[in-house]
Swiss-Prot record:
Gene field: mlt-10
Gene Ontology BP term (one): cuticle development involved in collagen and cuticulin-based cuticle molting cycle
Gene Ontology cellular-component terms listed: extracellular space; membrane
Keywords, in A-Z order: Coiled coil, Developmental protein, Glycoprotein, Membrane, Secreted, Signal, Transmembrane, Transmembrane helix
Entry protein name: Molting protein mlt-10
Tissue: Expressed in the major body hypodermal syncytium (Hyp7), the dorsal and ventral ridges of the hypodermis, hypodermal cells in the head and tail, and the pharyngeal myoepithelium, but not the lateral seam cells.
Result for mutant: residue 348 to R: In mg439; defective molting
Record flagged with keyword Ion transport: no
Amino acid sequence: MRNLNLILFTALAAVTYANVQPHDISQNGAVKDGNHLRIDLNETSSVELMDKWLSQAFSGLMAAVASKKIAKMPAEHQNIVQQCSKDAKDVREHAKCLVKLLDAEKSGKLGRKQYQKVVKSPETIVLPENPKMLTKKDLEKAENAGAAENNENLEWIGSFGTARAKRSYKVVHRDSYALRSTDDVDGMTKLAKSLTNTVRAMKNKTERAEPWVEAVGRIKKLGEEAKREKKNREVMKKRLKQMIDNTPAEFVDPRKPVALKQAEMEDENNEIAKLMRKKEADEIRVPLKFLRKAVKTALMLGGQNVTDFDQKTLKMVSPRMMSIVPEQEDESLFNLLSPSLFSLHDEGEGIEKLTSLPHLLKKLDNHGQNAWMDFIVEAAGVSDEVTKTEKVFREKKEKELRGTDGVPLYFTKENATKILGNEEKSKIEVFEDLDKSYSEEQKKKLNDDGFAFLTEKQMERLYGKESPYKHTKALKKFKRLRDDPEKYIEKDIRALAEAEKFRVARRADIVSSPFILTPLTFASAPLSNTFIVLSPLVLSPITLSPAVLGPIILSPWVFVPLILSPRVLSPLIVNPLVFSPIILSPLVLHPLILVPGVFNPIILSPLVLSPLILSPQVFTPLILSPFALNPLILTPMVGSPLILSPFVLSPIILSPQALFAVVLSPYALSPLVESKLIAAEVVLSPSWLS
């Protein structure tokens, strides 16, 4: 396959692959180890996991590219590309879907939607350097471009606009100045401070008093954070859906659909709760409906517009007292005798601003105003409620990131250092520095497109001499790709689509890695083109895992059934088998050499060119398993009948058979050569040339 240069994803995956150190395992699954969970993987599982991660990384990048370009397509074409991506079975097929998208874009089929007219106003008017080249049209553009800027400095008198001149500052000269001291504070200010201290003493508060401005600022910050979180939640749901729709089912991170479903269920539960609250409110609002109708009738008689009045919220004789944020203009709200009075801010309009406490306290100096505002905020318990709300908000966020026992569901620098050592700490610090170095443009690209490109300085930090991920060759290559990197991504996607197959690298052989209680299901990849040496299998069934070129040497099997797992060119050599039946698993070119066995029935599993050599067997019957070119050589057998298993060209050579039977198994060209039969029967099994 062509050398791929996908920026960042390939490099990170390669670095991670290089640093994996798989361990031998005694059991498989999550194990509680102190304050963390440990999942032990053998070498095969580690390689398979890395293969999966790399495939997900490539598919993730391609899904991000598709999400960016697919927005320009009509809805029906979007569905075609998304369905193609969902049906893809591997990275190569996914890349082919992307190539169709890229080709359509190049051919101009992904232009603006039909009948959509885009009008773009230039931000800057560029005029020719030579004044003689100016045309009347150019001058009109220049005049119109500056009109908006000039209008900002106009003061209108009737229908005439006059430019406002900048006011000059008047300089005052004095012979001396008097500095204020604490004794100069007026009585009202002292009273406010005294009242504030009294309230704080009653609440047993000893910490620094929080100014009212800070309390109001915290409230605004909480409100903005709640809005931002709601917006981020919607963006996250949209992004997850796009990534899932544009990623093959094979490579979808299983956590993403779960997260999307969970988010949707939470939203549904919130909506249900709102509807229930609304229903309860409706039950007690029956008398209020008469009031609403009366108000509506009065307004109609007064000649006022009552359009959509029934859909509006009626606020009647319900003044807001000491509000902490300004009243928002809301067209869905009908306000009747419900002003905002004595607000703690000086914003808003009309009565709200005139009656606000900062406005009423303007007769006092700044110290007096702030002192009385501090008292009012403290007496009302605003700071305490803000602190409680912040605590609830913080605990909710922390709860989402921790397990039921309070253990974080993620690696922190502290626990990673404790578990994995200082080397892993240095790796985490590299990514901490990298995260802090992102520019606003990079953050925007990450949010909008799902990927961004590193600067040379960032690449130096990640792959340079001082980094634990030091990779000089990769660094040089990535620096060369800084010119139009998206072109290289497109080039590599096309290379993936044309490749015959996609693999990380040649699979390493599995050596000295026991499999205990480790079911191998759909494990064709790690069992093919791999030597398995000195790796016993115990209680580890192999199911739906065909294997090609996967010899197993010096690796005994104990209670390892082979089910629906054909094997080709995968001999077993010096490999004892105990209670390991072979069921619905044809063996082709699969010799068994020095493979003694006990209780290993072969059922519905044809054998071709799979001789048993020096492999004594006890209670290993062949049932409904025809075989050809499958001699038994120096392989004595006890209690191993052939039942409904025709065979041809399969002589039995120097292989005594005891308690042996051939039942309903015709055979041809399969003579007995120096092989004594003891207590043997042949029933309904004709033979030819044997």
